[in-house]
């Protein structure tokens, strides 16, 4: 189903004297569709896809929102209506790829999601006409170069499901690592290991969304520099291990 502006552009090309074959090759629109638009330009009401309300699967949405803010983007279909949501996932984490695809299928009203292999990573892709309604943070340019804020209905979902949001952000732009140190005990040097979580993002707004949600669930954090958050206290790492865990 094509929106009215797409239909008008196609018919304008035909009005320039071009053949239906020529316009069809350029736009990907069938000749039959263009012929039908001469009789009726407006789409039938039953064919129109209405903008969605808030997603019903809030758990999956909160996780997918975190993934989108970290490694996701939305782009318009090059020749027709609708948009693609893409989330880049490293090949190293097949479990993350599975979780991303499952969340996208659940959130997408059409249930559509598939994978595109690239060098070193997989793009999980879903097509849907109204992705920008579900992710109003979409806009021109890079996320860290524009303001990022949650809509009230998004904030309500994150407040209800904070750990899923944190997990999505960690899975996209975070990691769990193990540091170590040595000390002398009774004249013998012993090695001690301790895990910690890191989150890195160039957007100060996304950093604040992350740390505000950490505060909400009682996780202590430290800002090492403007784009890095460290979680190292034992109790907080234990909380993160319970609800997030390492990528796999």
Regions found by a protein language model. Give the residues of each.
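Internal intein/HINT superfamily modules and their associated LAGLIDADG
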Residues: 1-248
